[in-house]
Amino acid sequence: MPQSQVATASPSQNAQPNHGMGSKVLSSDPNASLPPQTAYYASPLHANSVSLPPSHLPRSTLHPLLSQQQQPAQQSPSLGPAQQNIQQPPSVSIASQPHYAEAIVPIQQVLQPQQYRQLPPNMVAATNAPQQHPQLQRMMPILSSNQPIQQLPLPNQASPYIPVPLQQQQQSQPQQQPQQQQHQQPQQPQPPQQPLQQQQQQRQLHSGIQQPVSTIVSQNGTYYSIPAVNHPMAGQPIAIAPVPAPNQAALPPIPPQALPANGTPNTLASPVTLPAANSAVQNAQPVPMTSSPAMAVVPQNKTAATSTLAAQQGANVLPPNAPESVRHLISLNEETWIQIGRLAELFDDQDKALSAYESALRQNPYSIPAMLQIATILRNREQFPLAIEYYQTILDCDPKQGEIWSALGHCYLMQDDLSRAYSAYRQALYHLKDPKDPKLWYGIGILYDRYGSHEHAEEAFMQCLRMDPNFEKVNEIYFRLGIIYKQQHKFAQSLELFRHILDNPPKPLTVLDIYFQIGHVYEQRKEYKLAKEAYERVLAETPNHAKVLQQLGWLCHQQSSSFTNQDLAIQYLTKSLEADDTDAQSWYLIGRCYVAQQKYNKAYEAYQQAVYRDGRNPTFWCSIGVLYYQINQYQDALDAYSRAIRLNPYISEVWYDLGTLYESCHNQISDALDAYQRAAELDPTNPHIKARLQLLRGPNNEQHKIVNAPPSNVPNVQTAKYINQPGVPYSNVPVAQLSGNWQPPHLPQAQLPSATGQSGVVQQPYQTQPSVTNNNVATQPVIASTVPVQTAAPSSQTAVPQTIHQSNAFTPRGKHASGSRNSISSTKSPQHKLSDQPRSRNNSISNVSHRERSNSVSSKSRETRTSASNESDPKKSTQRDSSKKLENSTVVSGSPSSSSKSDAAKSIKPQKPEPALKPVEGTADPKSTKRNHQETEKTADTDVSSTEPVKRQKTADVNDDVGEEEVKQSVSEQVDSAQLTSEPKSESLPKSPEEKSDDTSNDVTTENTNDINGDSNMDNVATVDKSTDAVDTSTATVAATTTTAEEELPQKESQERSSPSPENQDSTPLAPKSVSPKQAARTLDIDENYDDDEGEKETVSV
């Protein structure tokens, strides 16, 4: 239709009626004789006011706006204005509305696929009163089949739907009632015409908002215009069809002669059923639909607002008075889209399937089958939050669907929300008619496994296998059961299951993964040779596998294995670090190997690297505490133990080590008993903890305050465990399964130190995620997929063996070459261990931790040492001079700078624990001792005091050991507990170098001061009286005899009673070397003061 004809219809340009339009009126009814009526236009339009069509409608399918409704009539010739006025029916109100039956034909009879219908807004809402619906004026334009169709916008709110001149002309001329057609209703009185303002308000009320576009639908040459309203959810326009009044019924189908040429009625492309806008008239809510899927797209990211909308609107989105044909059409469209989606799933086209299901939701936003299929696709894509939203929406509509509860529980499990997963599984068991669903029990088994309840997890998995022996996940269940049996120390059953799935491992695991698990089981059984063979078979396929190299390095570190080799172990671990230098466990194990080789500086550096990468691992801090203990830095050891306890207070070994520290340093027997009692609560089956408690609680416990240390020979009574690190991404390479109780295998009995106790089972594993304990499965277990759990799968972190420290690895087996000394080195008590330990600070952590202020040689210590050596043993003077030259000339290679030392100390230094170590009664005041040291250091030689201590010559240590071996003193009952307990209290504060005297207490104090300053063993010489020598030598002898086997103890004591002579007692240089309580207390005082100084330095720097 030419645009000029449209422009002439505007009242602003042409106030006269358009007589040319009358010649284009047609009627589809051959018997109709109704004359044409005046043209009816929606709004004034200018010649250039034709708007572009909306994006969802093709331009070729649009036509000019014809807001009139067609009346079936034959095509009549064009009439003039006079004939048109005469033939108009009288008393027809232009503003009145027609009945539904007169305004629109049934929706299922809409035929032409590229034509649309449209009604004016004042016809959208139908009232209950039939008299308010007069006959609508209709026109039938002539449109050729090849004529282009255009879309025009609806008028704005301020324009009338009928031009004012036409309204006046129609009101002034009498109108004639036309003859009723086949579907014509009886004539009813019309209300008076409403004012223009009321009409505008009514249109705004019915439409809600201004309509941007309109839709035109045609059937059999009749055009209907329906205004468009905004989408209630997405803000997009949708068309609204009128609803008949309650007293009106749907029209019958169109007879066959009225069908189009092809004879098949076509439905709308994709009608949408969404909640309609609120109508002012009761029982007149329109049925929402759209002509294009793009007009009402359901968002893919379904949010909680959809669930709220579902609860408010309900599943039934159609009004109660909607025609049955509309309901049927919507249902057919919904089922069709669902079938299309299922067909796309058969072709493995998930995107098309998802789009089809969303189209079904546009037909019915609360279609349970469509939402269920969408949720399943999202769950398979691991988009669990979106899947949870869809499942929750389904359960809002029907909360009794047990299958949906089961799927929801799985999604919660994958999100690591165990409490909600547990609740969902309970609801599933309650609502399912038959709870014997293998997938349900498979998920429940994974849930129990994540909770750490291995017994319940085992029962759930066995129930799943009994319900369906051919379950699709049967091999994965066998794998999980093998892991559970390994954690329960049922190694035979675990090996049987792993061998059963060796030929058919669950995907994506491979045969190498199963061999790795088999090797780990052999390692737990202490069959190290078979474990090494299994690991080497994996390493043959993956030569640079970090975890396999790590496990092989740890096997070579084991002293009980036949292939023990610390150098080879370090080589394996170094290769593991080359493959993955971010693994903290490899650094930790290298540190253990260096400690076994007594390379304490390198061990400290390795521990520091491990702490940098995993600072919240209590195992690392426990090992650092043992290292500090061995180099006599007791305050640092206490800090490290306290940090480990704060991270995980359920490690019995840490409490045992803490009790050893309290007992050895200050004789704090009450604190030691508390620590031992805590360790016994965590590990009640440990016989060594019980024996230590009985010894300290016995009637003669005062006798063992100094001499008796923790059990010297502590065997490994517990199997190795690993500590889990959850949340590691899955890997296809073989890695050992790490449960919550997994720990690296321990060292042999011969290397276990008496200071720290045995390796035991961790009752509460260390965790990095607080939500789950004993995390034994993957972070995202899969119920319906084939991906096995992550715990079974090898990963780059879960296979890291983390030990609860076994201090046996850190005890030096003796640096001395004498054969008699080697018999005691592996079983000596802490007192003998500390006495044998060289005092040279280059063997300690102090070089790295920047503690040169107390380790430097002071003038007081050198003067006192010189006087004491001259008085007691002139032979030691020459050795002292040589050692002094070494101190001034030799520097330890590889020691870090002072700044790096300070940073290293700050990086690992924890806060001081409670209770702090208490000084022994009768010892020197820490503050006064510090003042004396400071005054003495002021007079020290600058070159000598600033020189870093160096390692002593090995020959000097050998000479000391030979001298100690020659000492065979008799232990008499006269020098028992009375002398041991009274001697420390008789000592007095150290005097200044100027106040030299010959009394024994000053000499003993000077000796202890020399020990504090950290000089070599040969410098620890003092002149004591006869009674003091007897006490010291008896103390050393008792400490040595307690470290030997029980059956040899009586014989040794008898031999030692008869062997020593007075000359040996007087000449022994190592008798005072056993660390007395006073010496330990003073050492700690210096450390505590240093901590205060460091704190002040940090405050000033800030």
Curated annotation (Swiss-Prot):
Keywords: Cytoplasm, Nucleus, Phosphoprotein, Repeat, Repressor, TPR repeat, Transcription, Transcription regulation. SUPFAM superfamilies: TPR-like. InterPro entries: Corepressor-Demethylase, TPR-like_helical_dom_sf, TPR_rpt. Residues 1086-1096 have a biased composition (Acidic residues). It is found in: Cytoplasm; Nucleus. TPR repeats lie at residues 334-367, 368-401, 402-435, 438-471, 475-508, 512-545, 584-617, 618-651, 652-686. GO terms for cellular component: chromatin; Cyc8(Ssn6)-Tup1 general repressor complex; cytoplasm; nucleus; transcription repressor complex. Gene3D superfamilies: Tetratricopeptide repeat domain. The modification Phosphoserine is found at residues 893, 895, 897-898, 992, 1059, 1061. Residues 1-94, 166-209, 739-764, 808-1102 are annotated as: Disordered. One of its GO terms (molecular function) is transcription corepressor activity. Its main location: cytoplasm. Residues 64-84, 166-187, 195-205, 889-907, 1021-1044 have a biased composition (Low complexity). Signal peptide: none annotated. GO terms for biological process: negative regulation of transcription by RNA polymerase II. Residues 1-17, 25-36, 85-94, 751-764, 819-829, 1002-1020, 1057-1068 have a biased composition (Polar residues). Associates independently with tup11 and tup12 to form ssn6-tup corepressor complexes. Acts as a component of the ssn6-tup corepressor complexes, which are involved in the repression of many genes in a wide variety of physiological processes. May also be involved in the derepression of at least some target genes. The complex is recruited to target genes by interaction with DNA-bound transcriptional repressors. This is General transcriptional corepressor ssn6.
